[in-house]
Amino acid sequence: MTTLACRKLAPHPESPRHQHAGPWLVWLHGLLGSRQDWLPVAQLCGDYPSLLIDLPGHGQSVSLSADGFADISRQLSQTLQANGIREYWLAGYSLGGRIAMYHACYGRHHGLQGLLVEGGNLGLENAELRQARLQQDRQWAQRFRQEPLPQVLDDWYQQAVFADLDPQQREQLVLLRADNHGPAVAEMLEATSLGHQPWLLPALQRLNVPYTYLCGDRDHKFLQLAQQYQLPLHTLARAGHNAHRANPGAFAAQVLAFLSQSSCLPPSSLSR
């Protein structure tokens, strides 16, 4: 059994859930991140117990590898089992959002109560696009393996999806992410390339648990994606692609509102 490194947060002592084992919030970070990225939001959602997970190749799971989405979904299921988590809400950002969607659609997700996705890509609709993305991700992976990490990160955060960042914010992210292990990041990047990811929209539309799609109001790429495919979109003010980092208070408020609303819905209802 492969289990991912993780950290548990108990509910606040004054929370009505403190003495009762209710559904957990399980948090999946993005590429180059770690479980620490979710800590401010998880603490603001302190009425619920949280499990913050380090994905393979990241944080304290840096020595772990994964052979694609199905393998990571299995590792997630085994981690939940090892921690005694039977009912849970799954939240993920960017890469973590893609893994969360895959797990909800195709994984062993017994006990899943709902899905929260922040800026996660649904996949690519045809083989030509997938092949082009595989080639692009292989080029990035080669750089992560061979070049000094700060140099690669400088270019990584110049990508269009990070256009809302100012120079100071980019510099802060480069410094924050420079403690990653380049070859481990490269392996995870290749294993979870959009070129390997299935097109998730049809399966998402068949989900029998509530789900929501969160997006910063400056994240034009993913706003357009959510609107194009009529995802259950909620936006966050003054935020780009990494909305939970830019505006953790508003993000936590959206999470809590979704949980409160969804807990009142019949099991087959979708929060749309």
Curated annotation (Swiss-Prot):
UniProt function note: Catalyzes a proton abstraction reaction that results in 2,5-elimination of pyruvate from 2-succinyl-5-enolpyruvyl-6-hydroxy-3-cyclohexene-1-carboxylate (SEPHCHC) and the formation of 2-succinyl-6-hydroxy-2,4-cyclohexadiene-1-carboxylate (SHCHC).
GO molecular function terms attached to this record: 2-succinyl-6-hydroxy-2,4-cyclohexadiene-1-carboxylate synthase activity
Catalytic activity: 5-enolpyruvoyl-6-hydroxy-2-succinyl-cyclohex-3-ene-1-carboxylate = (1R,6R)-6-hydroxy-2-succinyl-cyclohexa-2,4-diene-1-carboxylate + pyruvate
The protein's name in its UniProt record: 2-succinyl-6-hydroxy-2,4-cyclohexadiene-1-carboxylate synthase
EC number: 4.2.99.20
Gene3D superfamilies per the UniProt record, alphabetical: alpha/beta hydrolase
Pfam families membership: Abhydrolase_6
Pathway, per record: Quinol/quinone metabolism; 1,4-dihydroxy-2-naphthoate biosynthesis; 1,4-dihydroxy-2-naphthoate from chorismate: step 3/7; Quinol/quinone metabolism; menaquinone biosynthesis
Keyword annotations of the record: Lyase, Menaquinone biosynthesis
UniProt record, GO biological process: menaquinone biosynthetic process
PANTHER family the UniProt entry points to: 2-SUCCINYL-5-ENOLPYRUVYL-6-HYDROXY-3-CYCLOHEXENE-1-CARBOXYLATE SYNTHASE, PROTEIN PHYLLO, CHLOROPLASTIC
HAMAP family found in the cross-reference section: MenH
Quaternary state and interactors: Monomer.
Enzyme class: lyase
Family as reported in the entry's similarity comment: Belongs to the AB hydrolase superfamily. MenH family.
Keyword hit for Hydrolase: no
